[in-house]
Amino acid sequence: MIEVYTDGSCLGNPGTGGWAFLILNDGGITNHFGYQLDTTNNQMELTAAINALEFIKENDEITLFTDSVYVKNGITSWITNWKKNNWKNSQKKEVKNKDLWIKLDILNSQKKIIWKWVKAHDINDHNNRVDLLAREAAEKLIKSSFD
């Protein structure tokens, strides 16, 4: 079984954002992070999950931990109605971040994933680590733009 922790961060919303993931597999730990200009927190949360799932090549069962209720509920519940309603939400408006949701949905259908929500800024060391990495990625981008 593979465990994945993901997080996204945004300095301003919209603003400069960072994403990170951490993968625990066979006793090893891998983490990656990145950043983006002019983004939102939700886009970074989705990007973290997408990049983590794209990184994993094995067909093992994955437990993905996110502190984003938006990502967890979106992929496990809301997306069913969005697809039925041609990517419209309950207010009949276009689903925000549709392009990212489509990517995540494809990855979700290709892998065996258990989605779990974890409380942010709490006692989970792995979640705290990806939170820090995502924030640092966004902060580095801002710092580099002033150098």
Task: Specify the residue positions occupied by each region the protein language model found.
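RNase H-like nuclease fold core
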Residues: 1-43, 47, 54-60, 132, ...
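RNase H catalytic domain
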Residues: 6-16, 51-129, 133
